Amino acid sequence: MEIIHYIVIIMTLLSSLASLLQRDLIKCIILSGFAGLCMAYLYYALLAPDVALTEAILGGAILPALFAFTVRRTQRIDE
């Protein structure tokens, strides 16, 4: 394994841990989306391009956008 793979694994772990410890929900969503993109890279490095593409679309774009929309929507109602 190349050194870049280890760096991406560490970045994935750190961003996932940071999203668990984060109190601000928008920052948590951004960090979990970043972890999804890192996972997509790792799937691509493991020669699974179909899984990588699915993870990049869902875990890196659609779900964070949906979560951000939901958080914004519920915060407006609470205020």
From Swiss-Prot:
Q: Which InterPro entries match?
A: MrpA_C/MbhD
Topology versus the membrane, per the UniProt entry? Multi-pass membrane protein
- Chief location bin: membrane
Key word Cell membrane present = yes
Q: Which Pfam families match?
A: MbhD
| Localisation | Cell membrane
Query: Which UniProt keywords are present, listed alphabetically?
Result: Cell membrane, Membrane, Transmembrane, Transmembrane helix
- KW ATP-binding (keyword) present: no
A GO cellular component annotated for this chain's UniProt record is:
plasma membrane
Q: Where are the transmembrane segments?
A: 28-48, 51-71
* Name used for this protein in its record: Uncharacterized protein MJ0437
